[in-house]
Amino acid sequence: MGIPWVEKYRPKAFSEIVNQEEAKTLLASWICARFRAPKEFCARWAKKREKEVAEAKAVLLAGPPGIGKTTVVHALAREIRYELIELNASDIRTGERIKLVVGRGLKESSLFGYEGKLVLFDEVDGLHVKEDEGGLEAIVEIVETAKVPIVMTANNPYDPKFRPLRDISLVVNLKRLSEEEVVEVLRRICTAEGAKCEEEALRSIAKSSLGDLRAAINDLQMYLSGGRKTLTVDDIKRVGERNPQLSMFEVLDRVYRARWFDEARAVSFNPSFDWEQYFLWALETVPVVYKDVETAAAAYDRLSKADMFLGRIKRMQEWELLPYALELALGGVSQVKNKPRLPPFIKYGFPQRLLLLAKSREARRRREALVEYLAQNLHISRSLARSDIIYVLSALARRDPKVVERLSRALGINAIDVKNLL
């Protein structure tokens, strides 16, 4: 297959990176404000003069996978002629190991022709504070003391555990590419490869990639593998597209109709899969699909065990248990003993719990407003106001209607609504 096209066509310069002008400007402005960089580069790209840009000790590039976070850093290092020291934080996890690798890289002399060194910590959100002893603390320490530019990348840096990194970094958000921008890149690659690609075929690849340029390029290379020089819509239909977004009805249908355990488990790999929503739907659809009492009981037994895992995950933040919960909730529910032959069409009902929550949303919002008012004015916690004070007010309101009127004026809602809340 040769060199991966993701690497072959990786942008070599800032100007070749599409749709990330704001991110490029912020990154260049930070480099030029704190470190030595070519004058022509700074004159072209460094347009931001804000205090927080110059004072940040590092840059944290944020955004979904495949939009060019790592590519931006590679292009920056090439533009300013810095040697790039790249580490994948999810591979080198312990603090001791991180310090050793970075320290060794910084102590070694730069190769001939480089003006300095730039450190890239890729995928810092791959660190798990509980498991990766000292990894996050080591990165923070390096950022605080390093005399060289440090850039980090993360898909989601807004997890509370990354607060220490965010506090000392300039967070730069990269945008997801539009379908048209992905198509333009794919079109250029087809031309460079001497391949004749139908426009609709490229649009189909771009649409299914959901703005992930890396995924789109990998898909294009897969479709044109084996020396093929043409690509049509029929080719894509024949081979199959990237996993589409699935509705919950489609998720349930795939799980219940799965012939093997792994086939049901694979549903969780779909980008649209929401395990919390799935669990609510599964609880109500099991008796619809499995009419036999013993079969339904077996499915509910797997769901109850999965619920035990989920409860522990939420209480203890032990997310490493999630795969086991999903195996029980998906494969376990699908592969029950005496599984019946399913009809061509199954009518899955919307979970009543979600319907009730939707219907009561406004009432719950008003009740929370009442709780907030009581907590602030009585100088008590919201939980105490919710569990005790509301019931006291309810008893008082039954004896004295003026209590309802006073609360109505304070909250700005009519007296009937206040009475209903109590």
Curated annotation (Swiss-Prot):
Keywords: ATP-binding, DNA replication, Nucleotide-binding
Family matches, as SMART domains: AAA (SM00382)
Lineage top rank: taxon: Archaea
Keyword Protease part of the UniProt annotation: no
Gene3D superfamilies for the chain: 1.10.8.60, P-loop containing nucleotide triphosphate hydrolases
GO biological process terms, semicolon-separated: DNA replication
Residues annotated to bind ATP: G63, P64, P65, G66, I67, G68, K69, T70
GO molecular function: ATP binding; ATP hydrolysis activity; DNA clamp loader activity
Protein name according to UniProt: Replication factor C large subunit
Organism encoding this protein: Pyrobaculum neutrophilum (strain DSM 2338 / JCM 9278 / NBRC 100436 / V24Sta) (Thermoproteus neutrophilus)
